[in-house]
C-alpha cells in the first residue's frame, strides 16, 4: 500500500473544490462561481487497491479586512503542515497576479509541489497556456499540468501523476471512507450551498449555519433523518432578504438544501430552518469558530 497527504491551495474561485469532487467522484465540497465558498479544511480520501491519497481542500487565500477572513487564510496556511505534496491551482482564463505570487512565496521551500492550470475549457489557446506554464516555472514549479473539470480523462491522468509522489505506508482510513467529516457537517454545508446558490453575491458571505439537531430515530425503519438548523445573518436588514416575500426565498433554500442532503447522504430528510441575527459576527472570533467549524 502506498499513501500520500496533499494540500490543494490557491486563490478563491480557482477550482479547488471542483478538483476535489472530481477526484473523489462525490460532491463533498461546495462548488460555486461566487468566491470564498469553502470555509473549512475539508479532507477527501481517494482509495483503490494499491493507493490511498488524502487531499485537503482549503479556503481561498485572499486579502481581507475581517477577522473571519483572517481565520480562513490561517486555515489554508495550517494545511501546509506535515504534508507530502502541495497542489497549487491557477485558472487558464486569468493572469497570474500578486495574489498567486504571494501564495507561491509561501510554498517556495516545498520540494514536492505541482501547479495545475485549471478551467482550460474556458481558455485553451496554446500560446496562452504556454505563457502561463512559463510563468509558473519561474515561480518554482517543475511539474505543471493543464486540466478541465469537464474532461474525466485529464483527472484520471492527474491522479496517476500524483501517485508518483506516494510512498509505502499503512492504510490510514477504511477503503470505503471518502471524508473524515460527519454527516452533520455535510448537512450544514448543503444548507450553506443552497444559500450561496440562491442569494445575491455578497449575502452568502454574511451567513453562518448551525445544525441544532440531527435526529436518526426513524433512520432504520424509514431511512429518514430530521434536521433542525439555524441560519445566522450579520445584520437585521439581511434577515428580510433571506426570508423573501411571504417566505418565498427561505422556502426555496429549504427545498434545495433538502434535495442536496438527500442526494449526498442517501436518506430521506425532514428539514426545518429558522433565521437569527448575530450582529457583526465576521469580526467576533468566538462566534464564527463556534458555529462555522
Curated annotation (Swiss-Prot):
GO MF annotations in UniProt: GTP binding; GTPase activity; ribosomal small subunit binding; small ribosomal subunit rRNA binding
Main localization (coarse): cytoplasm
Alphabetized UniProt keyword annotations: Cell membrane, Cytoplasm, GTP-binding, Membrane, Nucleotide-binding, Ribosome biogenesis, RNA-binding, rRNA-binding
Sequence ranges assigned to domain Era-type G in this UniProt record: 2-168
UniProt signal peptide: none
Region (G2): 36-40
Residue ranges of the region described as G3: 57-60
Record flagged with keyword Nucleotide-binding: yes
Location of this chain's protein in the cell: Cytoplasm; Cell membrane
Similarity comment: family membership: Belongs to the TRAFAC class TrmE-Era-EngA-EngB-Septin-like GTPase superfamily. Era GTPase family.
HAMAP family (UniProt xref): GTPase_Era (MF_00367)
UniProt-listed NCBIfam families: era, PRK00089.1, small_GTP
Protein name: GTPase Era
